[in-house]
Regions:
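Amphipathic alpha-helical dimer-interface segment in Rossmann-like NAD(P)H-dependent oxidoreductases
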Residues: 121-141, 181-182, 186
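Conserved mid-core segment of classical short-chain dehydrogenase/reductases
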Residues: 47-52, 74, 87, 100-116, ...
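Active-site loop of short-chain dehydrogenase/reductase
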Residues: 6, 63-64, 91-92, 137-151, ...
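C-terminal helical subdomain
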Residues: 209-281
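Canonical Rossmann dinucleotide-binding motif of NAD(H)/NADP(H)-dependent dehydrogenases/reductases
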Residues: 2-34
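A glycine-rich helix->loop->beta "capping" turn
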Residues: 3-4, 61-66, 84-97, 103, ...
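Catalytic loop of short-chain dehydrogenase/reductase
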Residues: 138, 144-172, 177-178, 182-186, ...
Length: 281
């Protein structure tokens, strides 16, 4: 797979999964902007050395990368990142929004600051990034956007107490993916998402793991960012070197919104009586 001549922005790329994505893309020939605010595990604070160190590490290997330290929770910060990519490499073909954080807060203790950080990085940031990247992506011969979701949000089976802020943000990115995959289709911009599992500092892991390695997720993300990927609106679940793709699809025979082609009920009592049928549809 060859990314020579293509330019990618990877957010949250100073460490963990994002660094693995950036390193693989750069190794495959891409120009890469490594963006990272250097926040802690709860999305607070900042350390400008994180992105710069990651960029220098790859530059020392002869790869074409630049570092970017900025606050992507603001519209202005996202615009500056896109402009950084254009200034450095003259084009933009790939946008990978990986930045995020995992924090637990019971619902009865939910507060605006905690929720706000989740909303910023998971909703505002991808929207603002796409807003400013869009005009450049439209000129690319193979424009790709990769957002980030989580099985902890998508599947009740994997949900955990205290993850309301995290789950809300990760599910929001699926809505953004669906909307932008439709908006991008006429101009050739493909929008997908990855739902990764990897042992990183978010898990409190500081040493190289023996399994669930971040670098084992990277090939899937590289594919979504590549010219070989021809699909849009998919979620790529990636864990331990294994991959499965899924997306939201409608039931056969539906004429939305006038006919769901399923169980009819005219009262709450009928809904209750036919609930077993309804939930199996």
């Amino acid at each position: 797979m060859n990314f020579t001549g293509r330019t990618a922005i990877v957010t949250g790329a100073g460490r963990g999964l994002g660094f693995s994505y950036a390193r693989l893309l750069a190794t495959l020939g891409a120009n890469v902007v490594i963006s990272d605010v250097g926040a802690d595990k709860l999305g607070a604070g900042g350390d400008g050395s994180i992105a710069m160190h990651a960029a220098h590490t790859l530059k020392d290997k002869g790869l074409r990368v630049v570092g970017h330290h900025g606050d992507l929770s603001t519209e202005q910060g996202c615009q500056q990142l896109v402009e950084k990519a254009i200034e450095a490499f003259g084009q933009l073909d790939i946008l990978i929004h990986n930045a995020g954080w995992v924090g637990y807060q019971p619902i009865e203790e939910a507060d605006a600051l905690f929720m706000g950080r989740a909303v910023d990085i998971n909703i505002y940031t991808p929207v603002w990034l796409c807003k400013f990247a869009w005009k450049y992506l439209k000129h690319s011969t193979a424009a790709r956007v990769v957002l980030t979701s989580s099985d902890r949000a998508m599947y009740q089976h994997y949900a955990q107490p205290g993850l309301v802020a995290y789950a809300a943000g990760k599910m929001a990115q699926l809505g953004i993916m669906n909307a932008l995959s439709i908006e991008g289709a006429p101009v050739g911009i493909l929008v997908n998402a990855v739902s990764p599992v990897a042992k990183t500092r978010m898990w409190g892991v500081t040493e190289a793991p023996e399994n669930l390695k971040p670098e084992w997720v990277a090939p899937g993300v590289a594919f979504l960012a590549s010219q070989q990927c021809k699909d849009s609106g998919y979620v790529l679940r990636a864990s331990n070197g294994q991959f499965t793709a899924t997306r939201f699809v409608e039931n056969p025979g539906v004429d939305y919104p006038v006919d769901l082609a399923r169980v009819r009920a005219a009262s709450a009592e009928q809904v209750a009586q036919r609930w077993n049928e309804i939930k199996e549809c």
